[in-house]
Amino acid sequence: MKTFALQGDTLDAICVRYYGRTEGVVETVLAANPGLAELGAVLPHGTAVELPDVQTAPVAETVNLWE
């Protein structure tokens, strides 16, 4: 999916808006968008950002001792 930066957007803000998190996805988005890091922390308005599909981490099952 392709999205475009809004005024004052940072890459992590875009990742949170689309993926709901930044952990493990910012690096993937940077890899899919060569040259994006050179634009600076605040992306110019209208910058196209390709958002690749990201694998979700498996949810670890927890056990409560007092159930």
UniProtKB/Swiss-Prot annotation:
GO terms for cellular component: virus tail, baseplate. Its main location: virion. Induction: Expressed in the late phase of the viral replicative cycle. Keywords: Late protein, Viral baseplate protein, Viral tail protein, Virion. It is found in: Virion. Pfam families: Phage_tail_X. InterPro entries: GpX-like (IPR008861). Might be involved in the peptidoglycan digestion during virus entry into the host cell. This is Baseplate protein X. The gene is X.
